[in-house]
UniProtKB/Swiss-Prot annotation:
Belongs to the PEP2 family. It comes from Fusarium vanettenii (strain ATCC MYA-4622 / CBS 123669 / FGSC 9596 / NRRL 45880 / 77-13-4) (Fusarium solani subsp. pisi). This is Pea pathogenicity protein 2. The lineage of its organism: Eukaryota, Fungi, Dikarya, Ascomycota, Pezizomycotina. Contributes to the ability of the fungus to cause disease on pea plants. Gene3D superfamilies: 3.10.450.50. InterPro entries: NTF2-like_dom_sf (IPR032710), SnoaL-like (IPR037401).
Length: 233
């Protein structure tokens, strides 16, 4: 049985600095936090030029609704979705960064809540998904930028705007979605008419699912990145 309280043995990048360390690396970690928090701050406010500054050329992002796309295509899809009524916001809850001793590669994990507003059949409600962003950063010519951004989707829920009005949920259909983002996936497909990825990284407790496998893979990928390997984005 999977150990629910521990990460995969050996997945910790032992040579990386995670806190304390030299003041110079603490400053770099502060820069990386600013970049990571830029995703929700810039995207939610439609500050697209600022949003672009997070990435290096050739970077990719993965989300439930977009799949794997180049960051420029993600921006274009976000704009198109907003014009069709998609209303997605984020709340940040803290971050941590592992950085290599040379100060050239880092992985920043940002705890956040994705909150998406839906209106179905006269019922207005939010779906909130607790997640962690995972940014793979690299410093080139003195500037940090993301090469890859993925998420762990850990748990979600529905919140009615008016408790007297709540939409009907098809319980059988709901069971087909991943445990970490089942309501988000259900309503993105039902209300937005899109196909959601069902194999996004989840939580350690999602035993017997591909989402647990992807959870662990993301940690191993971070270790390889911090140890200088080339990774497929």
């Amino acid at each position: 049985m999977v150990n629910l309280h521990s990460l995969p043995q050996g997945s910790r990048p032992n040579a990386a600095i995670r806190n304390n360390g030299p003041d110079s690396l603490a400053l770099e970690r502060l820069k990386l936090r600013e970049l990571a928090e830029g995703w929700p701050s810039y995207r939610d406010s439609c500050e697209w030029e600022n949003f672009e500054s997070i990435f290096h050329p050739g970077a990719y992002v993965y989300t439930t609704w977009s799949g794997r796309v180049a960051y420029q295509d993600f921006i274009a899809a976000s704009k198109a979705g907003m014009d069709k009524g998609a209303f997605i916001m984020h709340r940040c809850h803290g971050s941590s960064t592992d950085i290599n001793v040379d100060g050239t590669r880092a992985v920043t994990k940002l705890k956040a809540t994705i909150t998406q507003r839906f209106e179905v059949g006269g019922s207005e409600f939010d779906v909130e998904a607790d997640c962690r962003f995972c940014f793979y950063f690299e410093k080139i010519n003195g500037s940090w930028g993301a090469r890859l951004v993925k998420h762990w989707y850990e748990k979600d829920k529905m919140i009615p705007v008016n408790p007297a009005k709540f939409p009907q949920v098809d319980e059988d259909k709901l069971k087909a979605y991943p445990p970490g983002y089942k309501y988000l996936a259900y309503w993105q497909e039902t209300a937005m008419g899109i196909k959601v990825l069902l194999d996004m990284p989840g939580h350690r407790r999602h035993v017997g699912t591909v989402n647990l496998e992807k959870h662990d893979e993301l940690y191993w990928l971070a270790k390889r990145w911090l140890e200088g390997e080339q990774i497929e984005v």
